Amino acid sequence: MATASPHEIAHKLGSGLLSFPVTHFKDDHSFDEAAYRENIGWLGQFDASGLFAAGGTGEFFSLTPPEVEQVVRAAVQEAPDGLPVIAPAGYGTSTAVQMARSAESVGAHGILLLPPYLTEASQDGLVAHVKEVCAATTLGVTIYSRANAVYTEAAVAELADSCPNLVGFKDGVGNIEQMTRIYASLGDRLTYIGGLPTAEMFALPYLALGVTTYSSAIYNFVPKFAIDFYNALRSGDNAFVINALNEFVIPYCNLRNKKQGYAVSIIKAGMTVIDRPAGPVRAPLTDLDAVELAELADLIKKVS
């Protein structure tokens, strides 16, 4: 993996399902590195094509930059040979640059560039932001389009022309027209990743737009179901996909939608259900209550 080019790694990411592990915390909310390392090894038994350490599901927004480096280093050291580990970079441009360099120094294989913190920006500003991060690392960079960093097709095209190591586009918006425009403009120049919460909900229509993979949060606690769902999607077994949506994914999303922030909290709850607890979420997120946890356990039984 160390000798693979950024585009070769991006191609591997696009060929299978992507793992976005939670970050384990102790009861005092400090990073539980031993538990995290053990879990990365456990997830490595399954057939993911990439591992995104300390991403949104991993509570990136609640981690300090030194903690992000610690998490990424642990993931790199514990991931199976041949499994690319992608590290996050975010916040303001200077911080994102530092995080990208840090990730490269501890052996990450790529960068997921999250939106800048808090502030709104023009397309010119977003382009300048991405260019600086790309210039700071030899790793391949995937931009995450969501929230206050929604890229137009013109901006993505300019970045693809200007940054040889821009290799991926992750969509967290869900605008079918915009995704169509970007794919029509750039085609196979980039790897496209679905990045909406519970991405399985959007996987079927997005596949037609060149989005061949997505970040699967449920892979954390029902990895076999997540892989089976993905394989059915890619093989055109729509009957399996629709049945899986009705049996698990849609009811799961109904539970997830009960409270803001549950897109992450429910993943750690799922880990608790399968007796692989990852500790509490950090504030400002909140954990599921006992009734919600029991409801989730009933859903998991259906697909386990």
Swiss-Prot record:
GO terms for molecular function: 4-hydroxy-tetrahydrodipicolinate synthase activity; 5-dehydro-4-deoxyglucarate dehydratase activity. CDD domains: KDGDH. Keywords: Lyase. The keyword Lyase applies. It is an enzyme of class 4 (lyase). Its EC number is 4.2.1.41. The keyword Nucleotide-binding does not apply. It catalyses: 5-dehydro-4-deoxy-D-glucarate + H(+) = 2,5-dioxopentanoate + CO2 + H2O. GO terms for biological process: D-glucarate catabolic process. It holds the Pfam family DHDPS. Pathway: Carbohydrate acid metabolism; D-glucarate degradation; 2,5-dioxopentanoate from D-glucarate: step 2/2. Belongs to the DapA family. PANTHER family: 5-DEHYDRO-4-DEOXYGLUCARATE DEHYDRATASE 2-RELATED, DIHYDRODIPICOLINATE SYNTHASE. This is Probable 5-dehydro-4-deoxyglucarate dehydratase. It comes from Rhodococcus jostii (strain RHA1).
